[in-house]
Amino acid sequence: MSTVEEMAQFVLLWDLVHGVVLNGEEDRIIWKFTADGLYTTKSAYEIQFRCSYCSFKPGYLWSAYAEPKHRFFSWLLVQEKILTADKLQARNWPCNPMCLLCKIAPESASHICLQCPYAQHVWELVQSWSHDLVRKPDANSTIEDWWTDSLQSMPKEQRRTKAAILIYTVWNLWNERNRRTFQGKEAEPLMVLQLIKEEIGLRLRACGKPCVP
């Protein structure tokens, strides 16, 4: 042991094993991921991929009347896997930690889309334009809960339309964030609403959906 850290680790290990009393029984290997302690390939597979799948039901997202790139972005967003400042900092990448939309709070996926005063203003405009089909989100909700709660208990056609509006709204909030980050340009919430309407209009003309009420 050549360093103070190694000595500290040795002392910690000693404390852990010093109080262990052996009972004379033969040691045996126990697999803690099954009830009987026996290893199975099925349990190993489930453990390996347990965190690889989204915990929400993505069917509402993939069936939305939106383009594939918008749906894929939203799939990452709902799992909070987009590269916001909090994620960049966790990777030790240099960045401005503050939200560039409001400039008053740290940036995260949930903040940009739900909590930011700028985003809340955009949602208010979208709510008015959609005749309350889409409502301003609860700032205390998680993205996953917001997405799931927003699309429950409604007819399939209406749900696919509403999901599209949600997707195009968060997509344009993210684009506004990127304009400010990489181009130094800022747009008012009304302009973001106009961009949302334009993208939905392009999709409607190309595919016949979604039809906003």
Predicted segments, located by residue:
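A helix-boundary/hinge signal
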Residues: M1-P213
